[in-house]
């Protein structure tokens, strides 16, 4: 177990160093931070002084080492567009993105697994066929189109739910949440459903495929031959083994909820990190772009590490010590 965790940690560090290098290259080759800060009318002396202040006159390895050290402390400098610390901007926007992503993940997991099990056990029924058709649409349609359709139906036509913004939020120390008010929930429903639909359909189809394969396994047939009730066979034996490969895919998909919330946040003008990143790209705000890249990579690395540990815990084959020699 310790060796397994150590290998994963080493891999995580290597991945983060690679991402940090890519983010650092943004500062080197995408725009000129001196020009972005001082403008075109700055004198050569002012430009040289600022380059020295920013450490841009130092050797490449020194600059990269300093960048990694600052990134490890969460320091990415000042936003070129807003003139504020990037860390404070991220801290303001992160709660909104996490709140949206976590609710979307719950929706995708609860309904995806439930519907996947149902369509596997009742695959000949009309409802099962209907759910499979709807899931195909969920996988095929792009999120921005789903969001626009939901806005058209529930915000414009029926006027049941708002179409943009986060609504009323409550500050709990550094954290802000909209889940403490009805207005906040109303603003959260449409973007959460939009973000969850693709993941829900993917999880549903994956669970169904794995469930059908497991139900044909010999140990399931043996459990039925022993006279075990269907509930015990389906949920005590089949579903447990179905979730082993599902865990890996689901974990990575949950990470993508945060990484790819950009489109959903843009459609609904949700004040999260995705919208901040789009604004940073529009104005070539390199510090914000670099911070977003590193943070998303860190989230993926952490989720992947947790998924590996869960996989290790669920699948007993991984806990069997490999022989050290011989045949």
Where are these regions (language model features)?
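An internal, D/E-rich "acidic patch" concept
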Residues: 57-113
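Membrane-water interface segments at the C-terminal ends of transmembrane alpha-helices
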Residues: 23-30, 58, 69, 134-165, ...
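Hydrophobic alpha-helical transmembrane segments of membrane transport/permease proteins
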Residues: 15-65, 158-180
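Cytoplasmic-entry segments and transmembrane alpha-helices of multi-pass inner-membrane transporters
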Residues: 1-7, 11, 114-150, 244-246
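Hydrophobic alpha-helical segments of integral membrane proteins
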Residues: 9, 60-76, 86, 90, ...
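Residue-level recognition of pore/gate-forming positions within transmembrane alpha-helices
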Residues: 12, 20, 43, 108-109, ...
């Amino acid at each position: 177990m310790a060796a397994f965790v150590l290998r994963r940690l080493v891999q995580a560090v290597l991945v983060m160093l690679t991402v940090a290098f890519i983010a650092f290259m943004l500062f080197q080759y995408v725009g000129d931070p001196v020009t972005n800060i001082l403008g075109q009318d700055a004198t050569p002396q002012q430009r040289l002084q600022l380059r020295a202040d920013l450490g841009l006159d130092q050797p490449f390895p020194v600059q990269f080492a300093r960048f990694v050290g600052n990134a490890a402390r969460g320091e990415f400098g000042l936003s070129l567009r807003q003139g504020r610390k990037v860390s404070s901007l991220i801290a303001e926007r992160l709660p909104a993105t996490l709140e949206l992503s976590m609710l979307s993940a719950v929706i995708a997991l609860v309904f995806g697994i439930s519907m996947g099990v149902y369509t596997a056990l009742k695959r000949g029924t009309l409802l099962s066929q209907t759910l499979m058709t709807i899931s195909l649409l969920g996988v095929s349609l792009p999120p921005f189109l789903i969001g626009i359709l939901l806005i058209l139906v529930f915000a414009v036509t029926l006027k049941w739910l708002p179409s943009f913004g986060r609504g009323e939020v409550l500050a709990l120390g550094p954290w802000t949440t909209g889940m403490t008010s009805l207005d906040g929930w109303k603003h959260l429903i449409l973007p959460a459903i939009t973000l969850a639909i693709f993941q829900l359909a993917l999880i549903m189809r994956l669970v169904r495929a794995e469930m059908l394969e497991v139900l044909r396994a010999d140990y399931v047939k043996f459990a039925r031959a022993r006279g075990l009730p269907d509930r015990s066979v389906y949920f005590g034996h089949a579903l447990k083994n179905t979730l082993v490969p599902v865990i890996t895919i689901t974990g990575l998909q949950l990470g993508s909820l945060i990484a790819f919330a950009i489109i959903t946040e843009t459609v609904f003008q949700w004040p999260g990190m995705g919208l901040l990143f789009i604004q940073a790209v529009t104005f070539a705000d390199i510090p914000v772009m670099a911070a977003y890249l590193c943070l998303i990579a860190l989230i993926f690395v952490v989720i992947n590490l947790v998924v590996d540990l869960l996989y290790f815990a669920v699948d007993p084959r991984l806990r069997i010590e490999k022989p050290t020699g011989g045949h």
